[in-house]
Amino acid sequence: MPTPLSRRKFITQTSLTAVGLTFFSCAASKKSSAVVPGLQLGYSAITWGGNDAQAIKDIAALGFKGIQLRSNTVKDYGGNPQMLRDLLQQNRLELPMFSSGNANINTGDDAGVIASHVANAKFVKALGGKNIQLTNSSRPKTGSPTKEDLEKYGRLLTEIGKQTQALGVQSNYHNHMGQLGQTPEEVDIILGATDPAFVKLELDVAHYKQGGGDPAKAIYQYKDRLHALHLKDVRDNPAGNSGAYTFVELGQGRVDLPAVFKALRDIHYKGWGIVELDSVPSKDKTPVQCANITKDYLKSIGIMS
């Protein structure tokens, strides 16, 4: 028969074990609730400021499976896309998205705009990629765009999408501050004017947040159009700083990223989430240091191992 002392010891040990198990269970639950089984993680080369060869090596070493390149690579590798494709393969990186750039409705030469993106799509196909990202520089300098302009942009996107799809390359609209599609209402009009058979959505969660929207809500709303995401964070700048906001590493801003990942899980999302940081948020950081901050955050919520 146990003595009173051993009984107390047993009760104490049992209680501590229960507390430990509860803590572990809560921590595990917090991580598992964020996991999105169909999510593949990539990283954008934009932070490296055009040094794409270094970006490829660094992003691969960080453990990301894909990289987003930009149209500047056409200048560097357009004459020999196989060289770039070999570099991607050597580093075991896919090309889930390519920034094709500006689709401006105000050039007076829609055919030329379309042709430039079709040319980029051919380059992407030569690299083994299947997606291009489309933005615009069509927002008026003062005031808001008209519904007619937003719908015109949607029609232009559709024409680009028809021709790139014929090549086996998907066109994706990217919402963006300072462009047509800055606000959630504008995004909705643009998407409503596009043909979903030819244009998909690449949702940038930080731009959507900065434009006054709820990125998690957008994921539910556009689940049938959502083809890719920019995983991004943003913070407000203190008064007196240049600019109202700064894009920052994941977990360092005010985007509710756990809600974003929950929404992706809820809709059974299968596709790419591409981390993007336009530039280092402070001059004392390198692109790799910023990427490691983001990686640590993704590991802390169970998205990366």
PLM region descriptions:
Residues 34-36, 56-61, 78-97, 118-129, ...:
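Acidic (Asp/Glu)-rich catalytic clusters
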Residues 14-16, 20-23, 107-201:
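Active-site acidic/histidine proton-transfer and metal-coordination neighborhood
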Residues 101, 137, 241-245:
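Vicinal oxygen chelate
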Residues 2-41, 49, 53-60, 184-199, ...:
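Histidine-acidic metal/acid-base catalytic patches
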Residues 39-44, 67-69, 95-100, 132-134, ...:
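Hydrophobic faces of well-ordered beta-strands that scaffold small-molecule active sites
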Residues 46-53, 70-81, 103-113, 140-144, ...:
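Acidic-and-aromatic substrate-binding clefts and catalytic sites of carbohydrate-active enzymes
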